[in-house]
Structure formats: C-alpha cells, structure tokens
C-alpha cells in the first residue's frame, strides 16, 4: 500500500521536441510550501528518443547527462573539440551529420549502450534540456557547464595609412 500511495503523490512533467521527450518524475517539497504541481525532489527521469532505447536514471545522472550534452554542443559551436568523455557518457562526432553516444551504466555487469543520432535529434535533445532548465515547474539542478562564447573576427587596425588609402578617394 505504501508504494501505491507514494506513486499517487508523484508528479510527472513532460518536455517534448519533435523526436525527443524528457519526463521528470518526483515530488513537491511541502516543507518549503511549494505548489502541488511543482517537482522539487526528482526521483527519476526518462529520456525517450524515437527508435532508440529508453535512457533513464536518478537526479545525479540527469545532471551529468545535461552537462555532457551542453559541453559537447559548445565544443561543436566553437569548433574546438568534437569529443566529450566522462565516467558516465562519451559523445563524439562521427561525421558532419552523425554523433555517437556511449552511455556507461553505474550498475555493475551492465554493458555500455551505444546510440547514434543525427544533428536534428541532437538539437531536439538540447531543446528538451533547455525547456527543463527554463521551467518553473521543476527545481533547477546545478550545472557545471561554463559556456565559451566564440569571439568574432575583429578588424584590427595596424596601419593607419593603409586604412586611410582604402577609405578616402585618391587626391589629385
């Protein structure tokens, strides 16, 4: 009976984008007088990608997965490194269109899961994570990602005489 009651109290919030859905399951924190429709204590999450196995775990796994995807996408944007590696997940760029994700289980005797996704699915996953992070219905988990914003090529003025001859018309 206890399992049934606690299961009834749990809330589920779904974040979706085209081929990907992120489901957050948990409870509101009544000690902080939070609303009943909020989730502050995340007990489980599920990442569902069309035609791929279900990916799920606890809140620590979710934080690591989000950090991995955000860091990897930042690498791609900055054209730095197209490989991310951690003890839980590896993501690497196979080619211009395909990314390989290796998920390592925290449980013993469970083989790693290798998934290949395209750019559109990667974008959908990132969109779901962005929806989750922006939501006021779910407690925001801590992220360790520091974004490196690419610097635009700046026009450097080294020789003032050269620039003057380019801008001004020739004087006769």
Question: Locations of the language-model features?
Answer:
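C-terminal single-pass membrane-anchor helix
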Residues: 152-172
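Cytosolic/nucleoplasmic/matrix-facing N-terminal domains/tails
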Residues: 1-153
């Amino acid at each position: 009976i206890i399992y049934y009651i606690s299961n009834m109290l749990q809330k589920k919030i779904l974040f979706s984008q085209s081929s990907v859905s992120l489901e957050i399951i948990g409870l509101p924190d009544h000690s902080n007088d939070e609303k009943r429709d909020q989730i502050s204590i995340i007990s489980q999450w599920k990442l569902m990608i069309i035609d791929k196995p279900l990916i799920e775990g606890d809140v620590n796994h979710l934080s690591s997965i989000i950090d991995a995807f955000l860091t990897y996408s930042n690498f791609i944007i900055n054209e730095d490194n197209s490989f991310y590696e951690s003890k839980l997940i590896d993501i690497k760029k196979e080619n211009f269109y395909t990314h390989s994700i290796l998920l390592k289980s925290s449980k013993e005797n469970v083989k790693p899961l290798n998934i290949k996704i395209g750019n559109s699915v990667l974008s959908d996953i990132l969109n779901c994570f962005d929806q989750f992070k922006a939501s006021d219905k779910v407690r925001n988990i801590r992220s360790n990602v520091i974004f490196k914003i690419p610097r635009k090529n700046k026009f450097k003025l080294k020789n003032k005489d050269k620039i003057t001859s380019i801008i001004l018309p020739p004087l006769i």
